[in-house]
A protein has these predicted regions:
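Long, intrinsically disordered, charge-dense linkers/tails
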Residues: 1-186
């Protein structure tokens, strides 16, 4: 629960009810319920951007134009490791975080089943989706920053904050993040 605290609070702020399903066999139960009842679907609070957990007709308008998004994506791809992250540009609430890391529901469920004895998939690679909030002020700042060094620092800091929120920042990467953060507040 503590690892997903920010995601839980964001979902509650949107008016969603959040269930705590933390039993080792819950993945099998969810699969059974979703298979038997076609109108039931479970989503993790950290499985996607909160705007996408429950599909709605209303679309959030992006502050960035399509051309600006097309210009921004390669700038982010140049800094973010492509072997671990798929980058997705989305118009979310401007109060949400600039970068959000999610793991596709299917990949996570397969991994959990493997851990509880399924074992059929071998070792699943860690793949994540990096959702870039095109309505966040910092993302606009990244796009409009003139110097490459500053832009890369903003992207790396935002990525590391997103990784930290998912407990993915460890070892040398964590040490580098802490040192960079100290430099930023000096």
């Amino acid at each position: 629960v503590e690892e997903q605290h920010s995601y839980i609070e964001t979902a509650k702020d949107k008016g969603y009810k959040v269930l705590l399903l933390d039993s080792p066999i819950i993945a099998h139960l969810i699969q059974k319920l979703e298979g038997d009842k076609e109108k039931i679907a479970f989503s993790r609070v950290d499985g996607d951007a909160v705007e996408n957990l429950i599909k709605k007709e209303e679309a959030t308008v992006s502050k960035l134009s399509d051309d600006e998004k097309d210009a921004l994506k390669p700038l982010i791809e140049a800094v973010v490791p492509g072997d671990k992250y798929t980058i997705q540009m989305e118009a979310m609430d401007s109060g949400n975080l600039p970068f959000v890391i999610t793991q596709p529901e299917f990949m996570r469920r397969m991994k959990e089943m493997q851990q509880t004895g399924g074992g059929m998939m071998g070792s699943f690679p860690e793949m994540f989706t990096l959702i870039v909030n095109t309505n966040h002020e910092l993302v606009g700042q990244i796009l409009n920053t003139k110097t490459t060094k500053k832009r890369e620092r903003l992207i790396q800091q935002s990525l590391d904050l997103a990784r930290l929120s998912q407990n993915l920042l460890k070892g040398e990467a964590l040490t580098t993040f802490i040192k960079r953060s100290v430099e930023l507040i000096k």
